[in-house]
Amino acid sequence: MSYDYEDLGLVAGLEIHQQLDTETKLFCNCPTERREPEEAVRSFTRYLHPTKSELGELDEAALEESRVDREFEYLAFDTTCLVEEDDEPPHRLDEEALATAMEIATLLDCSVVDQAQVMRKIVVDGSNTSGFQRSTLLATDGEIETDEGAVRIADMLLEEESAARIEEHDDGVTYGLDRLGIPLVEIGTKPDIRTPTQAREAAERIGMLLRSTGKVKRGLGTIRQDVNVSIEEGARVEMKGVQSLDDIDDLVENEVGRQIELLDIAETLRERDAAVGEPRDVTEVFEDTESGVIAGAERVEAVRLDGFDGLVGREIQPDRRLGTELSDHAKRHGAGGIFHTDELPAYGVSEAEVEALRDAVGADAADAVALVAADTDVAETAIEAVADRAETAIEGVPEETRGANEDGTSRYLRPLPGAARMYPETDVPPVEPDPSDIDPPELLTERVDRYQSDLGLDAGLAEQVAYGRYMPVFETAVDRGVDPTTAAGTLASTLTELRRDDVAVENLTDEHLLSVLELVEAGDLPQEGINPALETLADDPSLTAEAAVEEAGLGGVDRETVREAVVEVIERNADQVEAEGMGAFSGLMGECMGQLRGKADGEVVSELLREEIQKRA
């Protein structure tokens, strides 16, 4: 659906989180490589609790998280140490990470601070063993351009990445320490964004600047976008964990729609003098129920929602309703979700049970009833959370942190964090960053233009190479005299083809690729031999390029040997050549290449085949 965003007063901002590609982590000497859970050498468990800030305040988001009793298990590896486990003080801030972050700050036109103080940001969802994340304000007051106007950069922080969530189970969560401590920059814009398309363009621009350094990690999960959205009369909502730039405009548009619907629901509820009753134990109502979910529960708690009839089931985002919002809050406290009378009778709940439920809580026809079926403790806390969210629905749109879903919608996570979650880190001394020696890199957009004008690549191939992960290999290959088009085609297309054919491309080192390209340039390997040579190297990475060429029988042959092979093919097909002349070319070319593939350049084969056919035509 299209909206008049100016009329609605849309205000949006971004937070971009990007991992840096450094040798070691931010506060220890462990490598930044990722590991598989089965590679863990041991595990340990922790319980986390919120602590007060230096002003004696508790952060609301941390406090809510702590109300959910969960055990956190951590997987340790032979590439992690006691710093990640919070059993050893952090080391000094990593110099490589600091230098890369300052380079990014320069590209964002930010001012680097005179002194950077490491802070502790309270996080009790288990993703940090210490219960806090170390974060450093490094730069402020930048700006980027978009087609719809400038977007100011509020700040850029250098911080440690959280632990990787491996598995969530009934009692808690399992995390991997391999990701914890990887250097990360967090870039926050000011609320200058006014449309969903501008939000996406701003994110793309920041992403391009980050990749221009050549010093950020690539791949799924290495960059995350958070989007802050509000409309006039609505509320600020932070949506976390957007993995793809393609999702940003849909996410913003759907959040605008959600807030519009919630405001309309709130107005209707106030017109109905809506209210929320007290939760009640209604377990007896369902003693003989045929609903499997309810029958298996220890306790059933319900709450009357005065004036809510027909509104709990109202859609506020694609396939998500007000009831889904209530359910999200119940789930945060361990329940599987909720039932509500806008969708009952259903799920094994009979009409008679619905009427008995209404009688038990004193609901009339204008009211709705929500219920939770779970263990006693869970049911009691979950129904309280549902009641609180229903109270908020009467007021309008709540400020909150939400998680981005893959379909462009979002789900409730927790309240918005406040300033009470930050306090100084006393184990790490402040640093005085000096950006005077920073030399800003060539932007990827400029690199694309140069590849076209100086190296003769077409626009599509130039962009593929410039934005691709093998851009540094391409630059080195060209510096070593390799033909740019050959290098670009190999790195942008050939490797993709091999990956689709299930070749273990990840086994190929940069030197493998460069050596194969140099053999082609030297005439020791025809272009048709690139694929089989790389396949051989991927199967056995211990080989050199020269050894792989020899093992695969790909060594180039001289022109006369090619001619002999061509003549042999023609003589085998003499009748066809006599009857069709050059019309036989295509079929004979395929036969020749089948015999010479990987040993002779296709252009040479084609040239000699034409010559020999013409002699006989």
Swiss-Prot record:
Q: Which GO terms describe its cellular component?
A: cytoplasm
InterPro entries, sorted: Asn/Gln-tRNA_amidoTrfase_suB/E (IPR017959), Asn/Gln-tRNA_Trfase_suB/E_cat (IPR006075), Asn/Gln_amidotransferase (IPR018027), Asn/Gln_tRNA_amidoTrase-B-like (IPR003789), GAD-like_sf (IPR004115), GAD_dom (IPR029351), GatB_C_1 (IPR042114), GatB_Yqey_C_2 (IPR023168)
The identity of this protein, by name, is Glutamyl-tRNA(Gln) amidotransferase subunit E
> Per the UniProt record, which EC number(s) apply here?
6.3.5.-
Q: Name one GO biological process term.
A: glutaminyl-tRNAGln biosynthesis via transamidation
Q: Cite the GO molecular-function annotations of the record.
A: aminoacyl-tRNA ligase activity; ATP binding; glutaminyl-tRNA synthase (glutamine-hydrolyzing) activity
Function, as annotated, reads:
Allows the formation of correctly charged Gln-tRNA(Gln) through the transamidation of misacylated Glu-tRNA(Gln) in organisms which lack glutaminyl-tRNA synthetase. The reaction takes place in the presence of glutamine and ATP through an activated gamma-phospho-Glu-tRNA(Gln). The GatDE system is specific for glutamate and does not act on aspartate.
NCBIfam families the record matches: gatE_arch (TIGR00134), PRK04028.1 (NF003107)
Question: What UniProt keywords apply to this chain's record, in alphabetical order?
Answer: ATP-binding, Ligase, Nucleotide-binding, Protein biosynthesis
Which transformation does this protein catalyse, written as a reaction? L-glutamyl-tRNA(Gln) + L-glutamine + ATP + H2O = L-glutaminyl-tRNA(Gln) + L-glutamate + ADP + phosphate + H(+)
For this chain, the family text in UniProt reads: Belongs to the GatB/GatE family. GatE subfamily.
